[in-house]
Amino acid sequence: MTVLHLADETEAADLAAFLSRLLHYDRSAAVRLQATGTALAVFGRPASFEVLAVRAVRLSEPYRGDPDTTLDVTVSAGELLESVDESAATAAVPAAVTGPPWAGVLPPRGGWRTEPGLPPAGALGATVAAAVAEFRSRTQELAQEHRTRAELDRIGREIWSRLVGETQLPVRAVHAAQSLRFLRPPAVVGEGDSARPPAASGEEDLALLSSGTWLRLRTPYGSIAVRRAEAGLGSLDVSVR
């Protein structure tokens, strides 16, 4: 079994925390792993958010000791979590699984440019809080006979599909970033989290990026990628690999 050597105990703890949050939303969650050199990218799709979450993890040595050897595999998030040894800063790569459809269609690796208009972190947090409050208020006001799954889903889609400020970023992407603790005050550290942003990601600041039909909310702790609302099947701009 292949063993990944993570940069340190903190990196291992942060990876475990990310996997735990994905599993909170889907106990059968899968993740796609891509490693090149000393950088590991972990892709996941938190259930119900309709976004991709990307977590960069630093390795202490290249995959299999060869900087030219790459890792690309989809595995069980639960099995990967069980293999993380925080004290040893290692993680064993589980057996490959038949990946869900999203795992075969990833955002582009390059061509990203900065998009204007993204509000600061505090305003993004307030936007999510207001959306959650509105959802609760509107659903609680429904008469019992109208409180169906279809109606709850309709209200949810209406609220979470709204755009953030003057951008094309849907509120659900910000909600996902906050739920996965990608979006948080730098000084706030919870169980399994470090105050240190992952150096391998190169993501020093909060930013909104675009590449083709994709948008990416970049934070110091990870990224959320989502297709633009108007993107159709006839204009796919993705990395299928």
Q: Residue spans of the language-model regions?
A:
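N-terminal ordered "arm"
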Residues: 1-58
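A broadly used, surface-exposed interaction patch
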Residues: 51-90
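Charged/polar, solvent-exposed surface patches and flexible loops
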Residues: 17, 21, 82, 137
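Short, surface-exposed linear patches
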Residues: 27-29, 54-56, 63-65, 238-241
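Long, compositionally biased intrinsically disordered terminal regions
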Residues: 84-241
